[in-house]
Structures are given as C-alpha cells and as structure tokens.
From Swiss-Prot:
Gene: lipA2
Record text on cofactor binding: Binds 2 [4Fe-4S] clusters per subunit. One cluster is coordinated with 3 cysteines and an exchangeable S-adenosyl-L-methionine.
InterPro entries in UniProt: Aldolase_TIM, Elp3/MiaA/NifB-like_rSAM, Lipoyl_synth, rSAM
Protein source organism: Prochlorococcus marinus (strain MIT 9313)
Keywords for the protein's UniProt record, in alphabetical order: 4Fe-4S, Cytoplasm, Iron, Iron-sulfur, Metal-binding, S-adenosyl-L-methionine, Transferase
Pathway the protein contributes to: Protein modification; protein lipoylation via endogenous pathway; protein N(6)-(lipoyl)lysine from octanoyl-[acyl-carrier-protein]: step 2/2
Protein name per the record: Lipoyl synthase 2
Gene Ontology CC: cytoplasm
PROSITE patterns tied to this protein: RADICAL_SAM
Location of the protein in the cell: Cytoplasm
Binding site for [4Fe-4S] cluster 1: C49, C54, C60, S300
Gene Ontology MF terms: 4 iron, 4 sulfur cluster binding; lipoate synthase activity; metal ion binding
EC numbers for this chain: 2.8.1.8
Amino acid sequence: MSSTHRPTQYSSILPAERLPEWLRRPIGSVSQLEQMQQLVKGNHLHTICEEGRCPNRGECYAAGTATFLLGGSICTRSCAFCQVMKGQSPQAIDPLEAERVADAVQQMGLRYVVLTSVARDDLPDHGVSIFTETMAAIRQRNPLIEIEVLTPDFWGGVADLAKALEAQRERLTQLLMAAPVCFNHNLETVERLQSKVRRGATYHHSLSLLAAARELAPNIPTKSGLMLGLGEEQEEVVQTLEDLRSVDCQRVTLGQYLRPSLAHIPVHRYWHPEDFKNLAEVACKLGFAQVRSGPLVRSSYHAGEE
C-alpha cells in the first residue's frame, strides 16, 4: 500500500467534521491564485499559506500578501494538527533562501512581512540565524518594510533544565536583536491537550519564551494564537488567555481548527461565530491590546493591521 494512503489512527471521518456554513468561502480569483503561486514557486520558496493549506490564502493572495516559511519544507517536530511535512530528515540549509525571499517580497511590493519557519531542532541555533539573515536581506532592499516573526520555541539540545532555559534565552536574544515589529509564538491549544496536539513542545516552554521576549525587548509586542475545536472547554480557553496575560502577551488570535487530511487529528467541535465573539470580549477585558477572534482567523491573518 502506498505510504500516502496508509491508514493512521485518525483515518475516520466523524459526522462533526462536516463544515458548517460559516466556514465555507470562495477560494478567490484563479488568476490571482496562480499569479502568486507562480511567483513563490519561481523563487523556489515555501509559504505557510500553501504548506499549511490556510483557508484564507485566496484572500491574502488577492491582496498580494503571504507568510514565508523558512528553513525548508520538512519539520523536525510532528505536531498532530500541522500539514507541513515531517517525520523525515530535515533539509540542508539553503544559503540563497534569504535572498530569494527578499527578492519575492520586493516583487510583491509588500509593506508588512510575516516570517515563520519549520522547527529546526537539528541546528545548533535551532534556526534563529535563518530568521535574522532573511530579515537583513529584506531590509537591504527596503529598510521601511515591517517584519513580524512567528517562531518555534527554540527549545532543546540540552538535558539540564537550567541550561535549556539559558540556551532558549540566548537564541531568543539573537532573534530580538534583529528588531522584528512583533514577536509571535503560538501556544496552539490549552494546557491539557498540549501533548496530544503539539508533540515535542510544551505549554510552559512556550510561556517561558513569551515571558523572556517581553523581558528582553519590552518595546516589541508579543503575540500568540490558539486553535479551537480540538476538545477544549471554554473555561480552559479563558484560563489560557489568563496565562498569556500573566506573561504580558499583548496580542492574541483565536481561530477554528480545520483538519488538513485524514492523517491529522480530527475536529472535535466547530465553535460558532458567537463563541468567538464572546471570547474576544473576554480577551479584551483581560487587557490584550489586539484581539483577532473568528472561525477563519489565523495567526498571520491581517497581521499588518492595527
């Protein structure tokens, strides 16, 4: 049997996964989609829009925006929700990737860029230099472009907890010295579901990263995101929002998890738009400076808007 059709523990389709009306949307103009896809492929790049099968990619492409995925297309983690390739040896670092991303940004005429990456636990700096080199290349062409980063947790490589925290902090320091306009790291889900959803990451490692970012660079806003529909309860979502505020996280995104394929963790529930509206009100009352909450919201959606 082909590996692409091999059954997994998630190979059943639950009735709850039939898309409700509020999650159905047009994909956008075919010509606009093709134009953006050709530009990305022509520069031998990856975008999280395509790799993650984002439901907003038609809208974002139509607006001439994209979130660039750095470090190749293979991740060293194996999160149960993510469409990005995993479970294979990571790719060799492409020394020309930063220049190609910068060229694409220039060709697209972007004013606000989001850079994210696969996890690169195989590298000594866990991929930090991939971010900083790409940021430098973009600014060399246009120093006025604003750049947001959406990063892995930069955790690992050291067995001792204290040394692991120190290593994470050193990697983060190197990234923040490049002065992104926003530092984004997603918790993805509530604490109870972390091991099921985010294999290789933990709730507290992520919170420690966000806390350190605020301490090291208080002028750079921090941001995090949650996917709903994985089996969490509303009380747990509120607790997670409170935990994010406890480390002074200033921006938050809340969106519906959509299953990329039968090989991924199933949708447990489709949250109603009113639920997202109510959670947005809670988040605002908790003191978040920016809240994006809706079924189709993703961490980079309308990222450049105040």
